[in-house]
A protein has these predicted regions:
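P-loop NTPase Walker
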Residues: 1-98, 236, 318-321, 819
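Conserved helicase NTPase motor core
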Residues: 2-12, 16-21, 76, 105-110, ...
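Helicase P-loop NTPase motor core
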Residues: 19, 24-32, 300-303, 308-399, ...
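Conserved RecA-like helicase ATPase core segment
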Residues: 38, 255-347, 528-532, 544, ...
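Conserved P-loop NTPase-based nucleic-acid remodeling module centered on helicase motor cores
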Residues: 48-148, 607, 629
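Conserved helicase core region in the C-terminal RecA-like lobe
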Residues: 78-86, 245-249, 273, 748-798, ...
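Conserved non-catalytic scaffold segment of RNase H-like nuclease domains
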Residues: 79, 494-593, 597-605, 620, ...
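Accessory C-terminal helicase-associated subdomains
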Residues: 199-202, 433-497, 504-505, 517-522, ...
Length: 857
């Protein structure tokens, strides 16, 4: 398939920026892939190309097309959230901090919000009915709005300040107040308990929410956006990194997301792609008009519009064109196609919703082709759920062999949000991040009945005494009654070794040390120093060189020794001591032990501790926990940061303050809390450490099987769907088995779970069921035949949209529904509504009148 003249113009434009407006089916992804191929031909490297899009499906399509057309697999292709995640990871890596954080999905956010809110309500009332009632998605929307407003007011995403001011302004907005209401069984229900909590104690609630996530190394989607924005706007990212930037689905891009990407435009050729008529995410902050106007005015973008449709035939194209003209007054060019294989649109008037379901069922039963090529679509999940229930009732009246299998995307498609899968993931997360309080809370609530629900969050209140929920997964608390026992004992016996490595790069598994520095000290003072330069086999990366400044020539002239000699001497220096570093558990400890193993040496340490983790336990409200931040907090001067010996000296001083002023004075309180609660956690500690050992051996199947049997996740009478989910999870995770370090690979994979999701079209093919999906879920999908159900007044447009007087986005939703079919579109609507014994007339959607008569049967 060749490029059209418009596609060719966009693909070969490198002397100007381009705004590519591409209506549904006009080959936008095809154009993007060819522009990337052309960039590579012109000498731009894969690392200098950045492609961003809105959905995982679009991301995978772009990757596949780029690979197909130019054979290149290393071009940077991300979703917007995935790019923000990468910015945060790269920033912390450049600071010498390897973050183990995970990304929380809306289920995690909803569960955490509900738990925290119910706990706070209990503090002021003994009424057991005083609980929150909103669904998980609604909680996520409210949290997101508060964080968005806080950012608009100019507050840092790290700061606990600003929540009160944000909430005060939002409470004046009726749209925000409406988020506290939901519909159940057709009736509007307002969660006054949660509304009043946010109104009266909202800042306190948001700080608890923030602390719960940050202390567990969890970020929600809003954290990704606002932390990435903070990094970019502070100048802590390389804004000249890319020579070609392509931002896809611009109509779905939020203003803040655009502000982040915009910072990289100055030294790049930029192409923004999208279709302004498919803007259906205004509720989450998309602002295509503002973005397009800014891009045209400030980046001299030339507008190129694709017109040749490659998806559907002339009837469906004329229907879409006529609809846009009638709904928006948009004059679109005639479709460039001679394809007449499609059919005119069928509009089917039904009786009530039961009759509509029966008619749709019969249409599918009589469909001659593969039923995975047909789709049932509606405006809302609520409408689809009602249809699904009616289809289920019809199926029950038929022999098994005659039944039609259906699935709803809301329940079946979101694999990683299935309860049984999230239970597995909670256990797996605890093996790589014992401090994940959200996972601990889920395990306790659903699978560990011997521990009282809420205990994990209650234990975090003892952070000032050094109590962390991760302590109960540490065998030392069962042996000694205190996670800090070995550290305190070593301090009293003058055998604490603070150490630090400067390295060839930021990968603890692949890079090598170029400097090992340490001091041995205790309560009696400092007793010995250790400082060696090491001649590495690997080349020193540019990033590492810019951090510490030591090249191989410098190392050679400053007594650089072999890694074997350095490890031998350090093992003797630290023999029998407790080793402490800053962020060492995520970097230095890993590199040290890996290189010791490589040299056939043993590091005989009495324990490992990390001042970053200690600080996070005692101090929850810090902007970050970098060594420089803690030095500033405690008045420690580190004049030669990123020299290993200078960093060691600073770490020693900070650790001494932590021990003398926090860890030792709080020992009695900490030990009493641990001793009172540890027995309830002991079986879980043993199990998690066993699962961890299985993962370290690369036995992912064994770990999943062990988790399933130990906590009854899969039982003989478990549903077939749960068994299949467990197997599918293993298939998704088995790539970890053959990696050099399975725990680290698993940690990286789990961090991306919330960002990955599934591809709708692949799920449909796998399940071999007829999909029921919303218009929003259909974005990026296409089907031979589409049945658009519920096209009645107050369904589309929705009642809230009609009441607001602004139906613009509802009209666009209808347009998206019109453009998903390749060959046939059937629109159905119920003409009656039955309440009890009463029957009422129901009007069709007024948008049906916008479809040209000559496109309708």
């Amino acid at each position: 398939m060749s490029l059209s003249p418009e596609q060719e113009k966009a693909a070969f434009a490198f002397d100007k920026n381009v705004l590519l407006l591409a209506p549904a089916g006009t080959g936008k992804t095809f154009t993007v892939a060819h522009k990337v191929a052309e960039a590579l031909k012109r000498g731009i490297t894969p690392a200098e190309i950045l492609c961003l899009t809105f959905t995982v499906k679009a991301q995978e399509e772009i990757k596949a097309d780029v690979t197909a057309y130019c054979g290149e697999t290393t071009v940077n292709v991300y979703t917007l959230h995935g790019f923000c995640y990468r910015l945060i990871k790269d920033y912390y890596s450049s600071e010498g901090v390897k973050t183990p954080f995970s990304v929380a999905d809306e289920v995690d956010v909803g569960e955490t919000t509900k738990r925290l809110a119910d706990d706070m309500l209990k503090e002021k009332s003994d009424d057991p009915d005083e609980k929150t009632v909103l669904p998980e998605k609604q909680f996520s929307r409210i949290i997101s709005e508060i964080k968005r407003r806080k950012d608009e007011l100019g507050f840092s995403p790290y700061s606990p300040d600003g929540f009160g001011a944000a909430i005060a302004t939002l409470l004046k907005n009726p749209d925000f107040c409406e988020l506290f209401s939901t519909r159940k069984f057709g009736a509007k229900i307002t969660d006054y308990n949660f509304f009043n909590l946010i109104k009266n104690r909202g800042a306190e609630f948001m700080i608890r929410y923030r602390d719960a996530f940050f202390s567990s190394d969890l970020l929600d989607f809003d954290d990704l956006i606002y932390m990435a924005k903070d990094i970019v706007f502070r100048g802590d990212a390389d804004l000249n990194a890319y020579k070609l930037i392509i931002l896809d689905e611009v109509q779905d891009t939020g203003k803040t997301e655009y502000e982040i990407v915009r910072k990289f435009f100055t030294h790049a050729t930029v192409m923004l792609c999208g279709d302004e008529n498919q803007t259906i995410y205004g509720w989450r902050g998309s602002a295509p008009e503002e973005i397009i106007n800014d891009f045209k005015q400030n980046f001299n973008a030339e507008e190129i519009r694709l017109t040749a449709n490659r998806r559907s035939g002339k009837f469906l194209q004329n229907a879409a064109r006529g609809y846009l003209s009638a709904a928006f007054g948009t004059a679109a060019p005639p479709p460039e196609t001679t394809d007449e294989t499609d059919e005119k649109i069928t509009i089917l008037k039904c009786g009530d919703e039961t009759d509509e379901a029966r008619k749709i069922y019969d249409l599918i039963k009589n469909y001659p082709g593969d039923r995975t090529n047909i789709c049932i679509m509606a405006r809302s999940n609520r409408y689809l759920a009602a249809l699904y229930n009616k289809f289920t009732q019809i199926n029950r009246t038929l022999p098994v062999t005659e039944r039609i299998p259906f699935f709803t995307a809301n329940a079946d498609y979101q694999f990683y949000k299935k309860p049984v899968v999230k239970d597995f993931l909670a256990f797996l997360r605890l093996t790589v991040n014992p401090g994940d309080a959200a996972s601990m809370e889920r395990v306790i609530k659903r699978r560990l009945k011997r521990v009282k629900t809420g205990l994990a969050s209650a234990l975090s209140d003892y952070g000032t005494a050094g109590v962390s929920v991760s302590d109960f997964l540490n065998p030392d608390v069962y042996r000694y009654g205190d996670a800090f026992y070995k550290l305190i004992k070593a301090y009293n016996e003058d055998r604490v070794v603070c150490y630090d490595l400067e390295t060839t790069g930021a990968d603890p598994y692949d890079d090598e040390p170029i400097q090992i520095s340490a001091v041995k000290f205790g309560k009696g003072g400092e007793s010995a120093e250790f400082n060696l330069f090491v001649m590495p086999d690997k080349e020193i990366s540019a990033g590492a060189l810019s951090t510490h400044g030591y090249d191989k020539k410098y190392i050679a002239t400053h007594g650089g020794v072999s890694i074997n000699e350095a490890i031998t001497r350090f093992s003797l220096f630290s023999d029998g001591c407790v080793l402490v570093g800053h962020n060492s558990s995520q970097f230095d400890d890993i590199m040290l032990m890996k290189n010791a193993k490589k040299c056939g040496k043993e590091i005989n340490a009495d324990g490992f501790f990390d001042t970053l983790k200690i600080a996070k336990t005692f101090f929850k409200a810090e902007k970050n926990y970098k060594l420089s931040t803690l030095c500033e907090k405690f008045g420690v001067i580190n004049e030669l940061a990123h020299d290993a010996f200078a960093d060691v000296t600073a770490t020693e001083k900070i650790l001494k303050i932590l021990l003398d002023e926090y860890i030792i004075p709080s020992a009695a309180v900490r030990q009493s809390v641990i001793i009172a609660n540890r027995e309830a956690f002991k079986p879980l500690c043993d199990d998690v450490n066993r699962f961890k050992a299985e993962i370290e051996r690369g036995d992912i199947r064994g770990a999943i099987t062990d988790i399933a049997s130990s906590y009854s996740l899969i039982k003989p009478d478990s549903p077939v769907e749960d068994r299949e989910s467990a197997n599918d999870l293993y298939v998704a995770l088995r790539c970890v088995e053959n990696t050099e370090n399975p725990p680290d690979a698993l940690s990286e994979l789990l961090a991306n779970v919330a960002l990955s999701g599934s591809q709708m079209d692949l799920v449909i093919k796998k399940l071999k069921k007829v999909p029921l999906i919303t218009v929003h879920q259909s974005k990026g999908c296409e089907f031979d035949e589409v049945i658009f159900a519920g096209a009645s007044e107050n369904e589309i447009p929705s009642y809230p949209a009609r009441a607001s007087g602004d139906e613009t986005e509802e009209k666009r939703v209808f347009y998206v529904a019109l453009t998903r079919a390749k060959r046939k579109l059937i629109i159905t609507y119920p003409s009656k509504k039955i309440y009890g014994q009463n029957e009422y007339e129901r009007a069709p959607s007024p948008y049906l009148d916008y479809i040209p008569d000559n496109c309708i049967e």
